Amino acid sequence: MSKLDMDTPEFSANEQELIDKEFTRLERNQSTYLDHAGTTLYAESQVAHAAVQLHHDVISNPHTSRSTGDYVDQVRFKILEFFHTQAEDYQVIFTANASAALRLVAEHFDFGDKGNFHYCQENHTSVLGMRQMIQANGTYMLRREELSELREGHRVRRVMANGSSSTGNSLVVFSAQCNFSGYKMPLETIQLIQDDGLPHFGKLIAGQEDKETNGTAYNYYVCLDAASYAATNPLDLQKYKPDFVCLSFYKIFGYPTGVGALLVSRRGAELLSRPRQFYGGGTINYAYAHAMDYKLRNTSLHERFEDGTLPFLSIVELLEGFRSLERLIPTNSNTGISTMDRVSRHVFTLARYLENQLKQLKYANGQPLIQFYNHQGYEQRSRQGGIVAFNVRTESGGYVGFAEIACVASLHGILLRTGCFCNVGACQRYLQLDDQMMDVIYKRSGRICGDYNDLIDGQPTGAVRVSFGYMTRTSDVRKLVEMLEKSYLSSRSPERWRFIEKQASQLPKALQQRAQSLRPRLLELAIFPVKSCAALKAKKWPLTAQGLKYDREWMIVDRNGLALTQKRCTDLCLIQPSIDKDNLILMFNGDTNSSISLPLFLSDDDLQAAARCRSKICRQPIEGSDCGDQVAQWLDQNLGLDGLRLLRQSTQRSSSSHQLSLVNQAQFLLVNRSSVRSLQFEEPLDETVDRFRANLIIDTGAPFDELDYTSLSIGRIHFKVEGPCQRCDMICINQRTGERSPETLTTISRLQKGKMRFGIYITRLTDKEDNAELNEEYHLICGETLEVD
């Protein structure tokens, strides 16, 4: 047992018991929640209080009732108290979130004559967005070191020439805690900037470079993005006095969402003076409809900037958020350590423990499993918060894509964050991506923020982030460590297929000749009439302009109109469709073994009577006809859910020039049994093939050579290859039992050098492209040969 295993926990046994009782839903859902930097979890008593209050109280619009306004003002006072300040020093402007607070500063900060805008590279995307609307002389990006140098005595003495006053107001924005790595910026920097300016301007990004004053002719103001920091750390505005502080309360309490704040100091308030381009209700003394005259309120700062009606029902619930936090984690009566300081100690200890445990994970050849992304490690709580960012390495030193980690974690009931976390500057810094590589990633490869394009040329485009809250337990950390160890160190690494290990030229001549004479054939046809349900296997099947006839023509949606897939309900694989001359028959191969039949053909009157419904597949809108209450009740009964409906597509989507049914990407998905065989799973090969839910199954004799195809023919039908299929965690579901196992995903990633590609998407060539008559009925037939053009 390591020393860190024996650290004294921050919370007493009684406190931990009370905390656990507030988060019983985690155990009920078998969830391990490790994304507190995204949002923390709300205590169950918070939402219970909200329900009681909404049930019993009558809370009117604050523009109607002064009592509601007083209630909102109580929340303002509590916010100031929480951050150790008072109304004489700071004012609270409610916003939608921290991003909206940053926008407010960007819109209204008065840079004066020649003021500049400076921001730290490792900032949230919202800070980058400020650049689009500021009216500064120059915009500069500062590296973290250029700010931390202020603590080392490298100061600028502002001496005005001939006793003149400052010619501009410069604004410096940085995060109190980096939401990517958890690094904490020294808050002493705030006053040093305000008093002595910047020793380095940073890199000029836009505007005009100041070559004359070297920063001596500016007043400096600091905007502190405290959204990440304030969630798990004490922020004392009596000790550290930024001019602007941006907050999101859901990061502190989990509930309510949609409420943030901009705290403005008296000094900062003087600079929020740029003319408004818009005003809303509650912010003016008067306005004329017949003329442009209006006058803004000036009795208090927040009245000038809080447009319209505040989300007052959410704001009043903030009080219960403060109460819950202070009730569950009271100030330590023996040591005087405050609530938020105790939270800070708890999450830092967990982060340090996780780093210690992950450092011990190594492959047999000594290669560390984990690459960490932080500045100074986990030795000082004053410089590091409860966030651990990392990537997983392969045994050969390559990278495992973060999308795979997200899928494997999901299969283990662990919720964490992957990508760049809306902090592209930190992402570029930690992953050591130069500007040229950034262009490759975002402009040439087509990656966009939030997608799962995780490896490009073997290099990661993002990372994995784990973050903690006061309700996180040591057992949650252990579960993550065990998942990584089991998935990447303890599991059997699949061997390469012999055809790949031994080059073709090394085969005996007889086998070489035999291999050359063999042509791969279409072995199996699978049609999926109902999206995400079981396959209908056939030896021969007709084609339409959309692909295989009836393939993904029906879909099940929930009460919100969202498509139900096996990611949410694995029992869908137990619904076995079949089609006879006139009907679609659905059989549930579960407890009930019941079936239901639907007509394939409807009269015009029936079509007119059917309800029209809308949904989306891969962000493309689709429209369908509701198949009625009888089948809806059958689905509810067998799947154990409420409000399900069966839709039949009635309009065609368009992808490029090809029509699609309810498939995700292309008309057909093709899988090579040789590629499946190379995975070497212990289960029967047919079961593994079924996991990939392909329409066309071939066997080429060599794994993964289908990835080199650009076009192919099966019989007299010609196809072009759209590209490889990027797999998700649905392939981890056994299509015969509904059971999940992560081995499929992790094995594919290893074989594909960190990518999750398996199978290829193909599209039938149209008449324009291949002179084929799509109006003529064609069939695909098992046993037909496959020709690669």
Swiss-Prot record:
UniProt-listed InterPro entries: Aminotrans_V_dom, MoCF_Sase_C, MoCo_sulfurase, MOCOS_middle, PyrdxlP-dep_Trfase, PyrdxlP-dep_Trfase_major, PyrdxlP-dep_Trfase_small, Pyrv_Knase-like_insert_dom_sf
Phosphoserine modified-residue sites: 741
Catalytic reactions on record: Mo-molybdopterin + L-cysteine + AH2 = thio-Mo-molybdopterin + L-alanine + A + H2O
Keywords: Molybdenum cofactor biosynthesis, Phosphoprotein, Pyridoxal phosphate, Transferase
SUPFAM superfamilies: MOSC N-terminal domain-like, PK beta-barrel domain-like, PLP-dependent transferases
Catalytic residues (positions): 422
EC number(s) reported in the record: 2.8.1.9
GO MF term set: lyase activity; molybdenum cofactor sulfurtransferase activity; molybdenum ion binding; pyridoxal phosphate binding
Gene Ontology biological-process entries: Mo-molybdopterin cofactor biosynthetic process; molybdopterin cofactor metabolic process
Requisite cofactors: pyridoxal 5'-phosphate
Pathway where it operates: Cofactor biosynthesis; molybdopterin biosynthesis
Top-level EC class: transferase
Domain of life: Eukaryota
MOSC domain span: 628-789
Annotated positions of the N6-(pyridoxal phosphate)lysine modification: 251
Family, as annotated: Belongs to the class-V pyridoxal-phosphate-dependent aminotransferase family. MOCOS subfamily.
Function: Sulfurates the molybdenum cofactor. Sulfation of molybdenum is essential for xanthine dehydrogenase (XDH) and aldehyde oxidase (ADO) enzymes in which molybdenum cofactor is liganded by 1 oxygen and 1 sulfur atom in active form.
Name of the protein in its database record: Molybdenum cofactor sulfurase
Species assigned in the record: Drosophila willistoni
Encoding gene (name): mal
